[in-house]
Amino acid sequence: MLLALGLTLVLYASLQAEENSFTINSIHMESLPSWEVMNGQQLTLECLVDISTTSKSRSQHRVLFYKDDAMVYNVTSREHTESYVIPQARVFHSGKYKCTVMLNNKEKTTIEYEVKVHGVSKPKVTLDKKEVTEGGVVTVNCSLQEEKPPIFFKIEKLEVGTKFVKRRIDKTSNENFVLMEFPIEAQDHVLVFRCQAGILSGFKLQESEPIRSEYVTVQESFSTPKFEIKPPGMIIEGDQLHIRCIVQVTHLVQEFTEIIIQKDKAIVATSKQSSEAVYSVMAMVEYSGHYTCKVESNRISKASSIMVNITELFPKPKLEFSSSRLDQGELLDLSCSVSGTPVANFTIQKEETVLSQYQNFSKIAEESDSGEYSCTAGIGKVVKRSGLVPIQVCEMLSKPSIFHDAKSEIIKGHAIGISCQSENGTAPITYHLMKAKSDFQTLEVTSNDPATFTDKPTRDMEYQCRADNCHSHPAVFSEILRVRVIAPVDEVVISILSSNEVQSGSEMVLRCSVKEGTSPITFQFYKEKEDRPFHQAVVNDTQAFWHNKQASKKQEGQYYCTASNRASSMRTSPRSSTLAVRVFLAPWKKGLIAVVVIGVVIATLIVAAKCYFLRKAKAKQKPVEMSRPAAPLLNSNSEKISEPSVEANSHYGYDDVSGNDAVKPINQNKDPQNMDVEYTEVEVSSLEPHQALGTRATETVYSEIRKVDPNLMENRYSRTEGSLNGT
């Protein structure tokens, strides 16, 4: 019933609000006591709203509080002021706040206000134990319950009464606490742990005050070791030296300890599962020095040190020698001595072999005597050895041999291995390769194996070896090795001795040459586009020739040549560039050809002209012969010509409508040798304008051609007969 009544009132109020007009005048926030507060203080954020309305009663509105754009509190109210209370402000409460008022479909939001909380609350420190044994572990719990993670924790381990921090651990936790383990060391006695918490606020880390834990008491697991030295007091070489290290172990230790005795850094004695370790040795001066005793468990190590001095009974012997380097056959003389000349027992040794039990030793040196020598001197139980003396006995080198590894002829620029070897003589051996009497390369070998040098000769060369070793004899020389080098052909060139333009009929000489090459050299001459050479020559020279005594047009073209020798590649031979040769005719030949051509042209023209006139004459003779019979032809003396081959025709006038003239040779077939005079009859018809129609004028013209002796000029006589109008 009450719920229904409340809903009715709310509905009524909302309906009233919809009917009334309102406006949100302003909205802002205030912070109490301030926008900046200390950690743990109460913080009150107020949202103040100013609303105007036509209603007589206050309108109901909604107020929302935001921190960093996330809503943290909201309330429905009719009041002008609403508050958001934080009882104890913490660092995580720092941020940007704003509030929003909502009334029906209208809302308004304040600007953002920044809240800062300074300081971090104190953390809490707890320990899992207050008493611990050396080598144990203490677990420290540092927590900050009031703050929100992530939290930065810093925990330190300190010795009570000092400010020295023995260990520090930093850790960022995503929880508001952290658990850290601290091992307990041998130097720890009474400990305290200190914890400090930090929280990142914006870009600044705010830290709490450091909080100290309760005290932790540390108990020893074992004591610091102690030394016992026997004999006490002065220790002399030959005495029996006892060095004893003693440790007291408590019942709380669950791990086995190890005791170690060291001289300098060398371990001389150890003991496990015991409370002591002993080092016993006959005292010698070299055993003097700094001794350390260490007691170690899994995590704990304790140590103490002592200085032991041993008095020398007699000094170390010295081995004297004539020379450390002897030639084979020289005297090897050794002597062992002790400073102060005490009575002692001596031995002279080579490595581990005793050569003499006396103070001196001599012999003729052999190469096998090379090695390290020493001597000993003994008084009572004390025996001392001298330092090692290296002695080398050198055998003289034999004459070295010299040879090369080439299996065939040596080609210019190719590598060749030249070896030097002395089969006898003490190593190491130094070989010097001499090239053209000058030092070229040096090699040292540690055996009698050959020393191999590498060279790339470019011409015939002489090599010699010089060998040397530790022997005092001067260096020995090998024989001279002469190396013959063959050079492949290089830069093939083809040329012509005269000009590239050769006159026909003159001599033509081609030359093929190389810049360099070992003879014999094979030269081959080629003409372009021909697979086989037209000339080949094998000569002991760097050039070859091809001669042609009379050049013709056939020799015109492109030429090249190749050259090869023993050093050339089997696949290809070096080739020259191409040479162009042109052959031209001699001037007199050109003139002769011109004369012949002109004569042929003239003869052709004469024959053509003669044929032309003969055709024309025949063409005219045919109509004349058809018009009238032939008449005998009279000579100049009115004599009849009687040769049967001569045909004389006399022409009379006839009607020629077309008016064409006709010409016919008279004695065409007569033998030219028997005929001195030839006649040609020409008829000319003309029509005079004053004559009547049907009257025709005819004129006959005879041309006489007389043939005379060829050496004389040809005489021509002409005779003309004519009759006009019957005259």
Curated annotation (Swiss-Prot):
Record-annotated Ig-like C2-type domain positions: 40-126, 135-213, 225-309, 315-391, 413-472, 488-578
Domain of life from the UniProt record: Eukaryota
Region of interest called May play a role in cytoprotective signaling, as start-end residue ranges on this chain: 710-727
GO terms under biological process: angiogenesis; bicellular tight junction assembly; cell adhesion; cell surface receptor signaling pathway; cellular response to mechanical stimulus; detection of mechanical stimulus; diapedesis; endothelial cell migration
Transmembrane segments: 591-609
Extracellular face of the membrane: 18-590
Lipid-anchored residues (S-palmitoyl cysteine): 611
Phosphotyrosine sites (modified residues): 679, 702
Subcellular location: Cell membrane; Membrane raft; Cell junction
Cytoplasmic side: 610-727
GO molecular function annotations of the record: protein homodimerization activity
Signal peptide segment: 1-17
Glycosylation sites noted in the Swiss-Prot or TrEMBL record: 74, 141, 309, 345, 360, 424, 540
Principal location class: membrane
Keywords for the protein's UniProt record, in alphabetical order: Cell adhesion, Cell junction, Cell membrane, Disulfide bond, Glycoprotein, Immunoglobulin domain, Lipoprotein, Membrane, Palmitate, Phosphoprotein, Repeat, Signal, Transmembrane, Transmembrane helix
Name assigned to this protein: Platelet endothelial cell adhesion molecule
Gene symbol of the encoding locus: Pecam1
Claim: rRNA-binding is one of the keywords in the record: no
Region (Membrane-bound segment which detaches upon phosphorylation): 698-718
Residues spanned by motif ITIM motif 1: 677-682
Purpose: Cell adhesion molecule which is required for leukocyte transendothelial migration (TEM) under most inflammatory conditions. Tyr-679 plays a critical role in TEM and is required for efficient trafficking of PECAM1 to and from the lateral border recycling compartment (LBRC) and is also essential for the LBRC membrane to be targeted around migrating leukocytes. Trans-homophilic interaction may play a role in endothelial cell-cell adhesion via cell junctions. Heterophilic interaction with CD177 plays a role in transendothelial migration of neutrophils.
Domain notes: The Ig-like C2-type domains 2 and 3 contribute to formation of the complex with BDKRB2 and in regulation of its activity.
Disrupted gene: phenotype observed: Mice show reduced atherosclerotic lesions. There is down-regulation of ICAM-1 in endothelial cells at the lesion periphery, and reduced disruption of Cx43 junctional staining at arterial branch points and in the descending aorta.
Modification after translation: Phosphorylated on Ser and Tyr residues by src kinases after cellular activation. Upon activation, phosphorylated on Ser-718 which probably initiates the dissociation of the membrane-interaction segment (residues 698-718) from the cell membrane allowing the sequential phosphorylation of Tyr-702 and Tyr-679. Constitutively phosphorylated on Ser-723 in resting platelets. Phosphorylated on tyrosine residues by FER and FES in response to FCER1 activation. In endothelial cells Fyn mediates mechanical-force (stretch or pull) induced tyrosine phosphorylation.
Species name: Mus musculus
Residue interval(s) of motif ITIM motif 2: 700-705
Membrane topology according to the record: Single-pass type I membrane protein
SUPFAM superfamilies: Immunoglobulin
